[in-house]
């Protein structure tokens, strides 16, 4: 068994992967990868890849930019499972929120970058387009530490709350479909949709008229207590 926590750091527009950090949750072994080939070889025999927002972000961009072949049935997305277990979790489901809960806080990368370079960003996200690579690696490594802790917590909670493996898998399947729709959109039969809209509006008008006939509107006359005259 080889279960690996994965986290990537990219440019603001996600066109380039700067680095990828991994952690074997069974051995504790960590790596920071800067090249696709070595990373591809490392995860080739992984039985499980774990990440926070793994399906919509990390796995998608790794497959697109580093040409990995990450498949859905080998993914465990801690963000999805967190939402499954507690949809209205106080504080939210972000890795930063979980870091506070698990007493292993995320690093404030932006603030630290600004301190290191001695200025504020010229535009939002500049710290990712022009990263301090040493800081970025440390930041990413902390993220995989938090994600590893969160994975163990969620596995225990899933068992304690008696959530089935089927429910977890279904959540991942639906998330993969939704993520694809968000990126590519979806086809819509516009002529049919237009006809359907007209039909529904006609039906609503008919229902409204029937309700007016059954419960006709009436006016309540208000009278002034002082003068006894009708109020306008």
Region annotations inferred by a language model:
Residues 27-28, 228:
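Detector for glycine-centered tight turns/loop "hinges" at secondary-structure junctions
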Residues 6, 35-38:
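Short alpha-helical segments and helix-capping/turn motifs at coil-helix boundaries
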Residues 1, 45-47:
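A general structural motif
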Residues 1-14, 101, 117-232:
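Conserved "right-hand" nucleotidyltransferase catalytic core of DNA-directed polymerases
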Residues 14-18, 22, 28-34, 47-158, ...:
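Active-site-proximal helix-loop-helix substrate-binding element of RNase H-like nuclease domains
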Residues 37-45:
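Short amphipathic alpha-helix with an adjacent loop that forms part of the alpha/beta core around
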């Amino acid at each position: 068994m080889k279960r690996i926590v994965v986290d990537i750091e990219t440019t603001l527009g996600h066109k380039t992967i700067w680095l990828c950090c991994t952690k074997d949750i069974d051995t504790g072994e960590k790596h920071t990868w800067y090249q696709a080939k070595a990373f591809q070889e490392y995860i080739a025999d992984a039985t499980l890849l774990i990440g926070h927002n793994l399906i919509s972000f990390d796995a998608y961009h790794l497959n697109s930019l580093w040409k990995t072949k990450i498949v859905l049935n080998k993914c465990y997305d801690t963000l999805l499972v967190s939402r499954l277990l507690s949809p209205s979790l106080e504080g939210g489901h972000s890795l930063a929120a979980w870091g506070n809960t698990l007493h292993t806080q995320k690093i404030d990368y932006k603030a630290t970058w600004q301190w290191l370079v001695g200025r504020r960003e010229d535009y939002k996200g500049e710290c990712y387009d022009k990263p301090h690579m040493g800081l970025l690696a440390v930041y990413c490594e902390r993220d995989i530490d938090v994600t590893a802790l969160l994975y163990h917590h969620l596995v225990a909670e899933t068992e304690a709350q008696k959530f089935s493996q089927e429910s977890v898998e279904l959540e991942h399947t639906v998330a993969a479909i939704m993520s694809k729709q968000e990126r590519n959109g979806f086809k819509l039969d516009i002529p049919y949709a237009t006809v359907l809209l007209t039909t529904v509006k006609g039906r609503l008008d008919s229902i409204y008229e029937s309700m007016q006939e059954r419960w006709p509107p009436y006016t309540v006359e208000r009278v002034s207590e002082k003068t006894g005259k009708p109020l306008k």
